[in-house]
Structure formats: structure tokens, C-alpha cells
């Protein structure tokens, strides 16, 4: 007789649920609105332009990881650290914007997806790779 696979391991391979995606998008939009208002008083965040690119929410909706990227030149790690310092304030402002049973605990991480995409783009346009991708007359 075969054992049924546990739902936790099955859920881990499926990815986030529709509920998690919807909650993450709500938090991302509300967080962007709070930041746009300019009410954050941290000296490292005043006059700093950045984007909240993605918010991933845990299955129980108690934890949210917010990925941030500076617009233009800037240190993404320093930006994430500055936002972590004011996360209590941001969480309070979010609770006024979005209604959840429990407001998720916020963690901020630098978004490296743009850097990875740029690295892949550079690799694809490098002379070594482009010679492999160009059509050659091998039929002769």
C-alpha cells in the first residue's frame, strides 16, 4: 500500500496560491502608495527614488518579503536596510490602507532580478555566444 504524499511537500512544488499572489499585490500597491506620499522621516530614504518590485507572502499571510530596487544608481542593500529600520511605521501605514486579519511582518530584500537579466543579456550579446547563434552554411 502506497503512502499519500504530504500536502506540504506538494504545495512547495506548486508555487504560491492565488490568495498569496493577491495579498502580495495588494501589499505592493499599498506600500508604493505609502512611499509615494513621502511621509517617511528616515534620512536615508528622504529624496530617494525606489520601486517595490515584488512582494511574496507566506502561506499563512503572516510574513511578507518585499523586494526593492533603487531607481537609477544606488545601493540596493543599503536601501533594504533603511526600509527595515522603518518597517514598524510602514506596517502601521499599511494597516490603514489594507484590511487583513493579521498585518504581515515585513522583511525587505534587494531585488537582484534586474542584475541577473542584464548579466544574461550581456552573455547573449558576447562575441563568443553570438557566433554560436549565427546561422552558418554547414551544408557545403
UniProtKB/Swiss-Prot annotation:
Keywords: Cytoplasm, Ribosome biogenesis. The keyword Iron does not apply. One of its GO terms (cellular component) is cytosol. The keyword Cytoplasm applies. Residues 1-13 have a biased composition (Basic residues). It comes from the Bacteria. It is found in: Cytoplasm. GO terms for biological process: maturation of SSU-rRNA. GO terms for molecular function: ribosomal small subunit binding. InterPro entries: KH_dom-like_a/b, RbfA, RbfA_dom_sf. Pfam families: RBFA. Residues 1-22 are annotated as: Disordered. One of several proteins that assist in the late maturation steps of the functional core of the 30S ribosomal subunit. Associates with free 30S ribosomal subunits (but not with 30S subunits that are part of 70S ribosomes or polysomes). Required for efficient processing of 16S rRNA. May interact with the 5'-terminal helix region of 16S rRNA. Monomer. Binds 30S ribosomal subunits, but not 50S ribosomal subunits or 70S ribosomes. HAMAP family: RbfA (MF_00003). NCBIfam families: PRK00521.2-5 (NF001802), rbfA (TIGR00082). Belongs to the RbfA family. This is Ribosome-binding factor A. It comes from Parvibaculum lavamentivorans (strain DS-1 / DSM 13023 / NCIMB 13966). The lineage of its organism: Bacteria, Pseudomonadati, Pseudomonadota, Alphaproteobacteria, Hyphomicrobiales. The gene is rbfA.
Amino acid at each position: 500500500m502506497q503512502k499519500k504524499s504530504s500536502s506540504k511537500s506538494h504545495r512547495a512544488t506548486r508555487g504560491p496560491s492565488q490568495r498569496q499572489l493577491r495579498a502580495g499585490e495588494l501589499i505592493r500597491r499599498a506600500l508604493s502608495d505609502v512611499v509615494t506620499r513621502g511621509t517617511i522621516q528616515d534620512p536615508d530614504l528622504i529624496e530617494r527614488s525606489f520601486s517595490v518590485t515584488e512582494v511574496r507572502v507566506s502561506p499563512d499571510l503572516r510574513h511578507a518579503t518585499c523586494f526593492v530596487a533603487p531607481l537609477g544608481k544606488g545601493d540596493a542593500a543599503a536601501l533594504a536596510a533603511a526600509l527595515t529600520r522603518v518597517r514598524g511605521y510602514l506596517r502601521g501605514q499599511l494597516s490603514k490602507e489594507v484590511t487583513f486579519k493579521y498585518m504581515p511582518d515585513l522583511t525587505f530584500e534587494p531585488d537582484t532580478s534586474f542584475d541577473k537579466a542584464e548579466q544574461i543579456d550581456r552573455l547573449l550579446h558576447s562575441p563568443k555566444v553570438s557566433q554560436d547563434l549565427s546561422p552558418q552554411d554547414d551544408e557545403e
